[in-house]
């Protein structure tokens, strides 16, 4: 659902930032 998409988005951003 929307929450899953949001989590994926946050995970991708964290990955890019190297956090």
Curated annotation (Swiss-Prot):
Keywords: Amphibian defense peptide, Secreted. It comes from the Eukaryota. The keyword Secreted applies. It is found in: Secreted. Expressed by the skin dorsal glands. The keyword Secreted applies. GO terms for cellular component: extracellular region. InterPro entries: Aurein_antimicrobial_peptide. GO terms for biological process: defense response. It holds the Pfam family Antimicrobial20. This is Uperin-2.7.
């Amino acid at each position: 659902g929307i929450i899953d998409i949001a989590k994926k988005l946050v995970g991708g951003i964290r990955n890019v930032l190297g956090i």
